[in-house]
Amino acid sequence: MQGSPQPSGEGIPLRLEITRGSFHFRGTVSLPVLPTRPRELVPLALALADAAAEDAGRRVAAEGSAVSCKKGCAACCRYLVHVSESEAYYLYELVERLPEPRRGQVRERFAEARRRLQQAGFLEALQQFPTWTGREIHERGQAYHALQIPCPFLEDESCSIYADRPVACREYLVTSPPQYCATADRMAIRGVSLPVSFFVGLARFGVPAEAKTLHRWVPLVLALEWAESHPDRTAARSASQLLNEFIEHLGMRFPTEKPSPPATGGCEERNA
């Protein structure tokens, strides 16, 4: 596949080629000129995730099926969506750039989601997400789904930041009827497996080699408050160094047969 995913802003053009399993990308990307941080790779990861999803859609069609995800189908927008730390900063900056009154409306929806979590007695458990084991990720994902809290970016059952939605949202594809996603029926949901996860590419940044967890992630519903309370103190490096590390992360994926609702993001643990 050929294409030209472009991170926002001007930079140095670079030819990029990625091959992982059945996915092959060859195109031109634009890297920042000055030293930068992993969060600056988010636009590139979003574009690459789109390319991988399109490739998967063609593969599914060739097999006589079709991806059933479409506008207005928002069942997965009530899942516990995982975003990388880089994406949490990206979403925070995105909301801060929104004009009023829209910025206030989005922030109020985040506040309402937080109130509902607190009323349900689930907020404290959710705030402990960095310590969760793989089993807890699944169990608490189920508990979160039962609350049916819509994503704060959801408006009229459609994503209001569709062009900037998280990588995990782009990588969650199914061929089964929407009602199975609504009930989070793992036995009935037919997920589309992807040969590469760009969520992992972002979420591996900052993970020590000896760490138990494979990824650093944040619940989307807590992304804004997390970004506010965790200033990005990552040391700036050359964009080419960051890109090389990002590409290396893509080879660290632990493939699964299908997505694992209702926790969307692909986080696993070494010793769950």
Range-by-range predicted roles:
Residues M1-A272:
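Short loop/turn segments that flank or connect secondary-structure elements
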